[in-house]
């Protein structure tokens, strides 16, 4: 069939570089599979209907780029030893830290090392906040100079205008 290609009356199976069918010389275009001009040569190389094409294999290459998921779970590998230094955490401590409610022992140890500073971490004293929110409460005085650490949200709230 190679010697009949491109001549009038014989369908030339033309494809682009991607294997897609390309319109013929007379604008006939690509036909549906099985609906082309069937050409049966003597050698039987292309025995069958014209217009049938081999599917192109698509290769997925990432180019060496690692794709990571958006979720992340990290925990510090060291913690305060109470003497101003750091010590490595063991596997047991890391697992306990990830479990919900697994930090019960850590809070008691930290409170014993810190002594009684007057209240647990995260508690806020809202003095004068009885009533229907008249805005006469005292904010900002809940930490004062007692040496308590401020929470992350409290630091943000402190920086917002109009929240005093």
Swiss-Prot record:
Residues 42-51, 128-138 have a biased composition (Gly residues). Keywords: Stress response. Residues 105-115 have a biased composition (Low complexity). Residues 147-164 have a biased composition (Basic and acidic residues). One of its GO terms (biological process) is response to water deprivation. It comes from the Eukaryota. Residues 42-164 are annotated as: Disordered. Pfam families: Dehydrin. Belongs to the plant dehydrin family. This is Dehydrin Rab16C. It comes from Oryza sativa subsp. japonica (Rice). The gene is RAB16C.
